[in-house]
């Protein structure tokens, strides 16, 4: 199995779909059970062998993500003084060998899923394969292989990239980007196709392994394009499409886990119900 030790997680933005609560709680910090959304991805990546995580955060203070992954000495002292020292371990959110690096993104700059990836790659001169996860969703699979491990296991050479495909009922494909797959490789992503025209029932949930070559292509795409004062986004899928059309390989990994999306109220409630074992009507 190829070893990948670096991951990028974009968590910047106002989370406007979740206003007004996101005025005071960052979207990626919305609670699922007793943990924030983003921590499910962080712990999964650590379990898969990642030791350096590059978080692209908003350039506002305070940064709740940074606070969550930092020691709180005042809280620890309080717990100890009240005879609750056994709870100090619950405040340790990162093992000692893992480091989170923070990159601040201006909300008024270029935007889209490619931008934070390019920012992290340039800021830290990344020139090796990296895992990319978004910060407001995760794969729930407590008894099985993690999605990150499935992605890594799908690679057959150091030049391969990979994308995670999540299987859903065919009648729901018209809400997603659907993967077109041939011999285990991605050939296209069809956005919101009709049920009849969908090439599969595997959807894109924006979880990738990017080879060093594809990572550089994403950096170039963001730097070389200027969409000006428009609403056009710098989508990570654009350089990915260009990359595979050049004959490069993006493997398609699958997971037996459940995709949980906290980006909407309904998805967030469902994620809490699943994680907490609450039966839904």
Locations of regions flagged by a protein language model:
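Conserved beta-loop-beta/alpha segment of the NTase-like Rossmann-fold superfamily
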Residues: 64-67, 75-79, 85-176, 182, ...
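Residues at the starts of beta-strands that form the adenosine-phosphate
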Residues: 6, 51-53, 99, 129, ...
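Well-ordered alpha-helical segments embedded in enzymatic catalytic cores
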Residues: 37-40, 115-119, 239
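N-terminal glycine-rich phosphate-binding loop and ensuing alpha1 helix
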Residues: 2-81, 85, 100, 144-146
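Active-site metal-binding loops of divalent metal-dependent hydrolases
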Residues: 14, 137, 265
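A structural signal for short hydrophobic beta-strand segments in well-ordered beta-sheet cores
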Residues: 29, 178-181, 252
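Short beta-strand segments
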Residues: 10-11, 56, 132-134, 164-167, ...
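Catalytic-core segments of class I nucleotidyltransferases/pyrophosphorylases
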Residues: 131, 145-156, 185-281
């Amino acid at each position: 199995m190829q070893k990948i030790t670096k991951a990028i997680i974009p968590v910047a933005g106002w989370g406007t779909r979740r206003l007004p609560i996101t005025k005071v709680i960052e979207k990626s910090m919305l609670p699922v059970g007793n943990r924030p959304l983003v921590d499910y991805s962080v712990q999964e990546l650590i379990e898969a062998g990642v030791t350096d995580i590059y978080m692209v955060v908003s350039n506002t203070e305070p940064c709740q993500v940074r606070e969550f992954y930092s020691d709180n000495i005042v809280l620890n002292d309080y717990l100890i003084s009240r005879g609750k020292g056994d709870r100090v371990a619950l405040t340790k959110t990162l093992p000692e060998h893992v480091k989170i690096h923070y990159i601040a993104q201006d909300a008024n700059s270029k935007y889209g899923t490619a931008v934070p990836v390019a920012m992290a790659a340039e800021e830290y001169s990344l020139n090796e394969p990296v895992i990319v996860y978004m910060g407001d969703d995760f794969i729930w699979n407590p008894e099985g292989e993690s999605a990150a491990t499935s992605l890594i296991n799908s690679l057959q050479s150091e030049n391969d990239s990979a994308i995670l495909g999540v299987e859903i009922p065919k009648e729901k494909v018209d809400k997603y980007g659907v993967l077109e797959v041939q011999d285990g490789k991605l050939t296209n992503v069809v956005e919101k196709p009709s049920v009849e025209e969908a090439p599969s029932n595997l959807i894109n949930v924006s979880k990738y392994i990017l080879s060093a070559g594809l990572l550089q292509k994403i950096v170039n795409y963001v730097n070389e394009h200027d969409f000006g004062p428009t609403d056009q986004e710098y989508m990570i899928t654009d350089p990915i499409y260009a990359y595979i059309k050049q004959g490069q390989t993006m493997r398609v990994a699958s997971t037996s886990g459940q995709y949980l999306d906290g980006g909407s109220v309904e998805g967030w409630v469902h994620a809490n119900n699943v994680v907490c074992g609450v039966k839904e009507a």
